[in-house]
Amino acid sequence: MVRTDGHTLSEKRNYQVTNSMFGASRKKFVEGVDSDYHDENMYYSQSSMFPHRSEKDMLASPSTSGQLSQFGASLYGQQSALGLPMRGMSNNTPQLNRSLSQGTQLPSHVTPTTGVPTMSLHTPPSPSRGILPMNPRNMMNHSQVGQGIGIPSRTNSMSSSGLGSPNRSSPSIICMPKQQPSRQPFTVNSMSGFGMNRNQAFGMNNSLSSNIFNGTDGSENVTGLDLSDFPALADRNRREGSGNPTPLINPLAGRAPYVGMVTKPANEQSQDFSIHNEDFPALPGSSYKDPTSSNDDSKSNLSTSGKTTSSTDGPKFPGDKSSTTQNNNQQKKGIQVLPDGRVTNIPQGMVTDQFGMIGLLTFIRAAETDPGMVHLALGSDLTTLGLNLNSPENLYPKFASPWASSPCRPQDIDFHVPSEYLTNIHIRDKLAAIKLGRYGEDLLFYLYYMNGGDVLQLLAAVELFNRDWRYHKEERVWITRAPGMEPTMKTNTYERGTYYFFDCLNWRKVAKEFHLEYDKLEERPHLPSTFNYNPAQQAF
């Protein structure tokens, strides 16, 4: 083709045809109807809307239908096999007269087979005009229209209902057809229906979504939304842009689960809109594990200030086993009675013996396993036991003590013994008398400590007293003065000096400097007037 002044001959021919077709009607329309928009700069740019399709120039014909077909080809740019615009083509050459952008419609005899849908690019005064009928097979949503025909995003501002909102830069309103009144979602499948693969379609989607979320539309900067606030959309862009069906990656990965989250106070939060994890509990982070498995990571939650706080500070949700496991691992508060009978976590100031509240708790725990302890805990009426409470003798010969676990042993019970077994009567007068004066101190101490409660203990104590040994009532030891050493201080009530005391544990005499008070020493033991020297038959 021959280019003249930057334009091809085909472009000039198209310009003459369209000018002759629409020039008269434009003049008549403009003169007969008052336009709502007097500024011609408010209409769409023809060079950006109608990309040139040079390979269709050879198919041009002088007939009207051929010219319209050529015009349709110029209007919608280079066509693919499905009659759709291809990406990457030049759209800088002006293709149409301005008369098209001012409301002139195409002749009614043009059929959809020509690839030219009837459209109006600005809002005429009549509400019936300016409607963009679309074939359901070729219908695009508002975002795809703006990207497909090259209209800038600023002039292609669309509302959430799919209708263009008229503003200073975009007076046109592009309506949806009547047969589909519901809004179509902005999905990749709708883009793929125009002969593009999913990667190409998402290239357009990414450019549009990046402008929306970054708050930039090419003309001014506006505070936008963060892609992390919409995890499903952000993750889908990532997966579709790569072209591989990668598994779903949660954008909240690495963040703490929503349970127990603590947000900033209302006065510290920023004025911008933000979404937190606790606002969407159904979208936990990747650190969330199966509730059936306990994990140490669920023991701590991250606050917005970056400090770790215990999960007990936040709300608890039913079925949250991680919080239950955490509570069990924490130190239990209050009195704890262990299965082995030990009591832990006793508060300070509480009575710790068996007469306080601790003893009552242990007794109740023991009564749960031993029913016999219930009678001792609650008490029993002695009159219901069949005992003679008025008897001066022992009420029950075999009852040793309330705390005894078994009855009395046979040797502890006063049974009737036949006289044949009582030999002391026959031999007591034949036994030699015991002469404790002949025994040494070591044997006397042995008789004293090994015959407790017996007359031999009393006799040994008397003999030790005669040998200048004294029993200290507070120290509970036997003491005597060291031989050849006089007290360093002596008064009527006490004396101080070196003394020997008998260590029964090590069985030896130990010298020690001691302050001795006389009133703390035991007096001479009192012996009965008559007693039998046989310790096996005569008890003290």
Curated annotation (Swiss-Prot):
Main subcellular localisation: cytoplasm
Stored InterPro entries: CCR4-NOT_su2/3/5_C_sf, Not2/3/5, NOT2/3/5_C
A single GO cellular-component term on record: CCR4-NOT core complex
GO MF, one example: transcription corepressor binding
Cellular localization per UniProt: Cytoplasm; Nucleus
Compositionally skewed regions (Polar residues) per UniProt: 96-123, 321-333
Phosphothreonine: modified positions: 93
GO annotation terms (biological process): negative regulation of intracellular estrogen receptor signaling pathway; negative regulation of transcription by RNA polymerase II; positive regulation of cytoplasmic mRNA processing body assembly; regulation of stem cell population maintenance; regulation of translation; regulatory ncRNA-mediated gene silencing; trophectodermal cell differentiation
Renumbered residue ranges of the record's region Disordered: 96-126, 276-342
Modification Phosphoserine, positions: 126, 157, 165, 169, 242, 274
Compositionally biased spans, kind Low complexity: 300-312
Keywords assigned by UniProt, alphabetized: Cytoplasm, Developmental protein, Nucleus, Phosphoprotein, Repressor, RNA-mediated gene silencing, Transcription, Transcription regulation, Translation regulation
Family statement: Belongs to the CNOT2/3/5 family.
Quaternary organization: Component of the CCR4-NOT complex; distinct complexes seem to exist that differ in the participation of probably mutually exclusive catalytic subunits. In the complex interacts directly with CNOT3. Interacts with NCOR1, NCOR2. HDAC3 and GPS2.
Function per UniProt: Component of the CCR4-NOT complex which is one of the major cellular mRNA deadenylases and is linked to various cellular processes including bulk mRNA degradation, miRNA-mediated repression, translational repression during translational initiation and general transcription regulation. Additional complex functions may be a consequence of its influence on mRNA expression. Required for the CCR4-NOT complex structural integrity.
PANTHER family registered for this protein in UniProt: CCR4 NOT-RELATED
Name the UniProt record assigns to this protein: CCR4-NOT transcription complex subunit 2
UniProt organism field: Mus musculus
